[in-house]
From Swiss-Prot:
PANTHER family: 50S RIBOSOMAL PROTEIN L3, LARGE RIBOSOMAL SUBUNIT PROTEIN UL3C. One of its GO terms (biological process) is translation. One of the primary rRNA binding proteins, it binds directly near the 3'-end of the 23S rRNA, where it nucleates assembly of the 50S subunit. Part of the 50S ribosomal subunit. This is Large ribosomal subunit protein uL3c. One of its GO terms (molecular function) is rRNA binding. SUPFAM superfamilies: Translation proteins. Pfam families: Ribosomal_L3. Gene3D superfamilies: Translation factors (2.40.30.10). The keyword Lipid biosynthesis does not apply. GO terms for cellular component: chloroplast; cytosolic large ribosomal subunit. InterPro entries: Ribosomal_uL3 (IPR000597), Ribosomal_uL3_bac/org-type (IPR019927), Transl_B-barrel_sf (IPR009000). It comes from Cyanidioschyzon merolae (strain NIES-3377 / 10D) (Unicellular red alga).
Length: 182
């Protein structure tokens, strides 16, 4: 087992697996090919210790304590970093939904639909009156929804096959998105 517990992967899609009792388990299949160590970050030169790793056309840094275990040119894959039954965290960018109203973005209730009301999907009152005479910063309103980074913790590894891995549950992002598994 390697000390490095973080790799990059791409999302393949969701499926289901069955346990020994016949229960269906939702799984997300991710693909992670070979990672190559291409450089080191040392405390003397950079102020911290890390590996620079290439996966396909992405280059990322992974913090480690001992660089000696990872010479430049070493190849890493799923079987060297993870094992079945292990719990992992997955970081990825969520699906962007564009400009969304306050109901979809913040789950606010709608206005009345009858008796002459015209504010069906309006935000209603957004602040106080003459005092303070302004809208407080951070007030939840319509705006961009999604497209930000999210971490899902505690996903269990159910299967590892060659360069693919089945994680129990859902991971953020679309099919083909880059994931960081830790």
């Amino acid at each position: 087992m390697s000390l490095l517990m973080s790799l990059l992967a791409t999302k393949i899609g969701m499926s289901q697996l069955f346990d020994e009792k016949g229960n269906a388990l939702p799984v997300t299949w991710v693909k992670s090919g070979v990672h190559e160590v291409i450089d080191h970050r040392t405390p003397e030169k950079h102020g911290y210790t890390a590996l620079v790793v290439r996966y396909q056309h992405w280059i990322r840094e992974f913090r480690v304590k001992h660089l000696s275990a990872y010479p430049i040119g070493r190849r890493l894959d799923l079987s060297t970093c993870f094992q079945i039954g292990q719990k992992v965290s997955v970081k990825a960018k969520t699906i962007g939904k564009g400009f969304a109203g306050y109901q979809k973005r913040h789950h606010f209730a709608r206005g009345p639909m009858s008796h002459g009301s015209k504010n069906h999907r309006q935000p209603g009152s957004i602040g106080a009156g003459t005092f303070p005479g302004r809208v407080f910063p951070g007030t939840r309103m319509a705006g961009r929804l999604g497209g930000n980074f999210c971490t899902i913790k505690g996903l269990e590894i159910l299967q590892i096959q060659n360069d693919q891995m089945a994680l129990k549950g859902a991971v953020p992002g679309k099919v083909g998105n880059l994931l960081r598994i830790e």
